[in-house]
Amino acid sequence: NKGLRFMSVLKRRSNNIKDGQYVIAFSDSRALIDISKDCGMTWTRRQPSDLPNVNEYFFSNDRTRIAMSGDGRHIYCSCYMANVGLLRSTDFLETAEPFKPDNCYSVYSIACNGRGNLVAIVCQNSNNKYDLMLSGDYGKTWTKITDSSFSARTLAVSYDGKYMVIEGGYSYSGARISADYGKTWALKHSVIGNSFALGLSSDGKYAIAQE
């Protein structure tokens, strides 16, 4: 698929659901989304008109990012387009609800834990800085975590949500780690900077950064 830009795959067994059973793929050239519920063997194609009140940029923007719970039920999509915000679904995108936290101009990246209740996003604020914001109730309420001394860009969350890693881009080099569900943070690697993507193992023991 030449236009494929982002894919999300379920990575955990839960309630008799197979590892990798649910797969979601977005295209950057067409306003389409492809969904598989059988490990990619068959696919169902959706378009913006299938989801009322959903901005088509969620389907056709190269900055679209996806986070999915371990059972495939909870799905969060972010779009970097200004004032577009987030998309939330509790039924594997059969239906979806757009929403946006306060003082969040655009969403740069997103991650969630295995249950899908703990959601982390990086938002560009009105001062053109990037804030890390956390929700512990499936995206209903949000708490700003970072301050003016650090601007988050990319992030990753462990399966249980206990461990998180964030990286701050060119001006705020270094990876910061939390081992208490985002309550406190420590600088663990001062060299890493401007990572395109971060990865964290399910137990939080291993992390990888692509620069």
For each of these PLM feature ranges, what is it?
Residues 1, 48-50, 57, 100-103, ...:
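Surface loop/turn motifs at the tips and blade-to-blade linkers of beta-strand repeat domains
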Residues 2-15, 57-68, 105-112, 150-157, ...:
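Repeated scaffold domains used in trafficking and secretory/extracellular systems
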Residues 25-27, 78, 121-122, 167, ...:
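Residue-level marker for isolated small/hydroxyl-bearing positions within beta-strands
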Residues 1, 34-45, 88-98, 133-144, ...:
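Asp-box/BNR beta-propeller loop motif
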Residues 17, 36-37, 69, 89-90, ...:
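Conserved Ser/Thr-centered positions that define the repeating blades of beta-propeller domains
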